[in-house]
Amino acid sequence: MEKMKVTKTSILGSDSKGVICPTLRRVKQLLRGTNMKRNTTILYFLLLIGIISGCTEKERRNSLRPLSEGSFDKEYQQHWIITDDSVKPFEVVREDKCIQVELPSKLPYSDLDTIFSSYKLIPLETSEEFLIGNIDRIIKCPGCYCIQDRENANVFIFEENGKFRCKLGNKGHARNEHLDAWSIAYDEKNEQIVMLDLTGRRLLSYDLMGNLKKVASLFFLYHDMAILGDDILCLTGSAYNRFSDIIDLSRLVLADKMGKPIRRGFPITEMIRNRFTYGDKMTQYKDKAYFTDLIADTVWEVSGKEMAPILNMTVNGSQRFSKDEKENMTDHIFEMRHAKQPHTIQIHISSEYIALPVAIPRAGSLIALMLISRKSNRQKFVGISTNHTRLDSYLPTTGPDGFADDSTLIYTIQPNTILLGASNTPIKDHLSKEERELLKNLKPDDNPVLLLERLIDF
């Protein structure tokens, strides 16, 4: 019996001999060509994605991005703030116009009546809804006072007579809330208070009635700021406590309104470990900012992309730290010199005066007051009496905390401080009957009191 022939059939079809017919062969060739083109297209597409991803990653590494709540990217911080040469340093100008100030080593006695022409007491309204734990910064705004209480993450606005006006925002994780109130600054151009929420990585802008106007993400970390027109002057570097992971360098950075750095750095010696080379706070007046360099004992003015030394302090005719000490600064050298010689870490400024609280270590670390007229460069050093029943025995030790106007200093005083010597202090001689009665009725846990002292022109 003849065996049956088995013919293998291609999926494309075949004749009885298993040979693909010309038509089917052509179809297969076309499909193979199509597959090759398709594979080539896919290959090019994947290659293009790889190139785009590489460029995007490179761009990502060299560009700013918003920081998420509680996040910290050390690489980005170092790249933009420390090492990026595309961000130019500040231009230092007017180095030859620096005022020279000699800080006395001994504490002179000065009758405050020869310095101040009038006094005014403004008790801040007290309520459980707006209790102030501590005043970290007070800003005199048109018609009101803005007060920062960092410890309790609160910012309050009080009327000029001390009546409560409003609280800025609420604590929380929502976009329109804040986790802390690390710093505040006044945006004079837009008449708004800007709050730095460092934990939440954002800036919140409020009008003077407490209405939220804008929320912006941070692109890098900083702990103090000043609003200079459309730009923000930021003080970056190590902060305190839970923010100790921030890079251990202190830098000034000028950022535009979008948060991008446009000026950076500061041409002085590097900071000593675990401490800023700068004073505790920057001070803002109009569209300029001021800060103190603690190693060079110099007060600087920053205006736009320029900065200038405006005041240099000496002790016994020379700077506290020699050139060699500045270049090889240590905590021990810094602390020892601070413990033995007078120094200042803050500055308050108006169009008329510069006020510098001065610590006198050999006088029990009491704070005296150096006053400088910006018109005449004349200087007055206000000492503190050792008579603790007098007005001038304890008021200067509290500050001052700023200027209420061009010639009036603001002191913030806790009620229990006033009550300690209220029965004997001559503060009553300078207050109205109503103010004296109010002083008498203060309670230790009441909100702080503002004391306005008007300077006598010199």
Sequence positions of predicted segments:
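C-terminal motif of bacterial Sec signal peptides marking the signal peptidase cleavage site
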Residues: 52-54
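Blade/loop signatures of beta-propeller domains
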Residues: 69-121
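Blade-loop segments of beta-propeller domains
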Residues: 124-135, 152-154, 163-190
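Short coil/turn segments at the loop-to-beta-strand junctions that recur within blades
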Residues: 128, 169-176, 217-223, 268-272, ...
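Repeated scaffold domains used in trafficking and secretory/extracellular systems
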Residues: 134-137, 179-184, 220-227, 273-281, ...
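Short beta-strand elements that form the blades of beta-propeller/WD-repeat-like
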Residues: 144-149, 191-197, 231-243, 284-300, ...
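Asp-box/WD-like beta-propeller blade repeats and closely related beta-sheet repeat scaffolds
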Residues: 180, 197-243, 248, 265-270
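Conserved blade-ending motifs and adjacent loop-strand segments that build the rim/top face
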Residues: 310-331, 375-405
